[in-house]
């Protein structure tokens, strides 16, 4: 019995909650980092796309105005048809205006005009090769802001072309349908800014927020700023949700694993109390007449949730948790419970092969457990054979005394899985043993030219010299059975004869005519 302090459950719960919270925080932080990186990549892509778009757009506009520069030598009447056509086929151009001797003299929108450029657009510097300004409106469209861009004629002083451009920022320039998580874009020319988040012109000093990206368009005095939140509500919600779920899962898993680790044998004891263990019996036959002369008793665990638990898994677990003794004691009780039914169908002298772990063999209760098992079985009907496997090193002196005592009370001893590395030749020299059980690995090699085959021959020769009876495990084919019979192996078991069966199925199997084909 394992005793824990009264606050064990509270400490365990607190530990698992702390672990869950720490994992939740860690996962949330990692998710924020992932979201931040995704936004960074997204903003880089967006600003690069914007820059490429504007570079291409203004390069095309420059090419168009270069074709219009010669028209500054003509009259408005001569220039107007081409000027109007160019404006019509240039994207987002409201109007092209020709300038000569610092005066505007022809517009694609209004025709002839005679207004000094510095009066019409004071912000433009006619002496620069390229200059830009943002206007609150134009004569033809007074309520909508526009960008004006000036291109000086390189061959004619104080002459050139300027264009008034529509500002259709969001759909045309910045693909807002693809960028649902940014706040807006601002175009900055000089000290004036026009943004998607305000309908009026702004002084650049009013843009107090830090942009996530900023780029200058080559060749023109235009700066583009991209504004966005560091995190969106979706980012925050998803990070906390993922962190919360991860923390919950880790907390529950921590509680389960720590419960198992800190309460040794709890599952085994619970399974014993709830009668989840049962016995399966695998018949052992003599190799000549194929009569049932014994059976190996195997413990099985049918878990209500996990189903059948593999024997290796729960036996290794029981050994690691120091629960192999109570588990074997429970096996003895199950055998005693089935004995009355087995007595009806099995002849006198049938052998019961039972696996015993070294920990149980050397335990204080071992002799009492064996005596209790013997007295619980029908008198003089069954022969108990204890199967020993070297999972741990046996204590030689103590084992010798125990084996002598077992023989004195009528219990026989078999060495199990011989030749697999679990057992050693030294056993055969130092201990008085009755049976040698040959591992299935050797049986599977029968009929194949492997190094295992001559080893099996040597094992059989050794057993005969020591006057030990031999039992072959894992016989699955008639060829293997025939080979073993011809080599003088005494007994065999395996799926060729029968798989391990629960009590009722084993009784039904015994009552059927047994005629295996050689």
Curated annotation (Swiss-Prot):
This is Probable cyclic di-GMP phosphodiesterase PdeN. It is a multi-pass membrane protein. The keyword Magnesium does not apply. Keywords: c-di-GMP, Cell inner membrane, Cell membrane, Hydrolase, Membrane, Transmembrane, Transmembrane helix. Pfam families: CSS-motif, EAL. The lineage of its organism: Bacteria, Pseudomonadati, Pseudomonadota, Gammaproteobacteria, Enterobacterales. It is found in: Cell inner membrane. The gene is pdeN. It comes from the Bacteria. GO terms for cellular component: plasma membrane. Residues 261-514 form the EAL domain. The chain crosses the membrane at residues 16-36, 236-256.
């Amino acid at each position: 019995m394992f005793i824990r302090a009264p606050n064990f459950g509270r400490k365990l719960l607190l530990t698992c909650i702390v672990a869950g919270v720490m994992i939740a925080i860690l996962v949330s932080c990692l998710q924020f980092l992932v979201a931040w990186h995704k936004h960074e990549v997204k903003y880089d892509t967006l600003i690069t796309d914007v820059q490429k778009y504007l570079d291409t757009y203004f390069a095309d506009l420059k090419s168009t105005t270069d074709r219009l520069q010669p028209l500054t030598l003509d009259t408005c009447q001569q220039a107007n048809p081409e000027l109007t056509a160019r404006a019509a086929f240039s994207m987002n151009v409201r109007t092209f205006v020709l300038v000569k001797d610092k005066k505007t003299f022809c517009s694609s929108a209004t025709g002839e005009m005679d207004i000094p450029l510095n009066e019409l657009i004071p912000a433009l510097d006619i002496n620069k090769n390229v200059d830009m300004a943002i206007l609150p409106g134009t004569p033809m469209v007074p309520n909508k802001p526009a960008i004006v861009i000036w291109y000086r004629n390189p061959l004619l002083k104080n002459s050139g072309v300027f264009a008034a451009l529509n500002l259709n920022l969001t759909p045309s320039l910045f693909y807002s349908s693809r960028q649902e998580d940014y706040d807006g874009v601002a175009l900055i020319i000089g000290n004036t800014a026009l943004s998607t988040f305000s309908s009026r012109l702004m002084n650049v000093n009013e843009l107090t927020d830090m942009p996530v990206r900023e780029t200058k368009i080559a060749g023109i005095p235009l700066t583009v700023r991209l504004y966005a939140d560091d995190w969106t509500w979706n980012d925050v919600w998803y990070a906390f949700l993922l962190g919360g779920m991860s923390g919950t899962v880790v907390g529950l898993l921590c509680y389960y694993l720590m419960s198992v680790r800190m309460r040794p044998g709890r599952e085994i004891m619970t399974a014993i109390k709830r009668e989840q263990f049962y016995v399966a019996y695998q018949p052992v036959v003599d190799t000549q007449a194929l009569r049932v002369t014994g059976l190996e008793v195997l413990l099985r665990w049918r878990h209500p949730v996990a189903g059948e638990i593999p024997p290796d898994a729960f036996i290794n677990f029981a050994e690691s948790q120091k629960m192999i003794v109570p588990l074997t004691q429970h096996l003895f009780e199950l055998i005693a419970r089935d004995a009355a039914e087995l007595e009806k169908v099995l002849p006198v002298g049938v052998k019961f092969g039972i696996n015993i772990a070294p920990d149980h063999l050397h335990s204080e209760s071992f002799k009492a457990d064996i005596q209790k098992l013997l007295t619980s079985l029908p008198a003089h009907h069954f022969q108990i054979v204890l199967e020993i496997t070297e999972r741990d090193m046996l204590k030689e002196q103590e084992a010798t005394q125990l084996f002598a005592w077992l023989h004195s009370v009528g219990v026989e001893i078999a060495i199990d899985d011989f030749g697999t590395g679990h057992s050693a030749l030294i056993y055969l020299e130092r201990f008085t043993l009755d049976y040698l059980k040959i591992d299935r690995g050797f049986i599977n090699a029968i009929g194949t030219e492997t190094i295992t085959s001559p080893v099996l021959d040597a094992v059989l020769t050794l057993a005969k010299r020591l006057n030990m009876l031999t039992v072959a495990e894992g016989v699955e084919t008639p060829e293997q059975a025939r080979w073993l019979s011809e080599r003088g192996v005494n007994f065999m078991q395996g799926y060729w004869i029968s798989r391990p069966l629960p009590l009722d199925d084993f009784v039904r199997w015994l009552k059927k005519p047994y005629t295996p084909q050689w």
